[in-house]
Amino acid sequence: MKTMVAIPCMDTVQTEFADSLLKLRPKGLMMHCFMPCSLIYKSRNDLGQLAIREKTDYVLWVDSDMVFPSDTLIDLMADLEEGRDIVAATCHMRRPPFRPVFYKKLRMGITPAENEHENWDDYPKDGPFKLEAVGFGCVLMRTSVLETVINKYGDLFAPLPGFGEELSFCIRARGCGYDIWADPRVQVGHKASTIVTKETFEAFRRATEHAEGVQAGAEDHD
């Protein structure tokens, strides 16, 4: 069994990401492939083609600003071993309101203005669930999925009108008959940066005081 860890990136990667990658526990043979490119969809396309040429069995897509537990690959592989083809870890956007990159509904209209998508904030929490699209911060799939998508569409990640490359791939994969799954038990972090101001401090203090008040109220009822 051979897995390629596919990392589309620019010229640099986050230190925390590198630390996570070094600690990632393999299952079978594991190769790491960075593909620097200013066009991320092209980087993903090139990585997909490389995975096919290298005759890998699986591809773990990981963005270079992710932080993940050492058992991430093993846990997602267990989901595929139950008969799935594509499964995503739980990842959130790195800017407010920090929504999960899960899409309950995704429809491509005749024009981009008619496209539809529905975020899934209150997703199931007890085990893997099906959805229509995911972000690709951390996704494991069988390499055979890539071959099937290329054979039908000639491309993997080229953006469709009104959609980014990740959702465009999901549309193609579903068009090939694949289900897309996510596992809420596999949580990964999204490295973010922020500009800290007085408003940032005040918002954090209000949230902290509220949490402390809730905890104190709960203790009073014990």
Model feature map: region roles:
Residues T56-V67:
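Short beta-strand-to-loop acidic/aromatic patch adjacent to the donor-nucleotide binding site
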Residues T56, E82-I86, Y178:
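Short, high-confidence coil segments that cap the C-terminus of an alpha-helix
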Residues R25-P26, E81, R174:
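Anion (oxyanion) recognition and catalysis
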Residues M1-K42:
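N-proximal low-complexity "stem/linker" segments adjacent to membrane-targeting elements
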Residues N45-Y58:
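Active-site nucleotide-sugar/metal-binding loop of Leloir-type enzymes
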Residues M4-P8, D65, I74-D79, I195:
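Polar low-complexity intrinsically disordered regions
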Residues M1, S144, T148-D222:
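C-terminal catalytic/acceptor-binding lobe
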Residues G48, P69-A158:
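Conserved catalytic core of nucleotide-sugar-dependent glycosyltransferases
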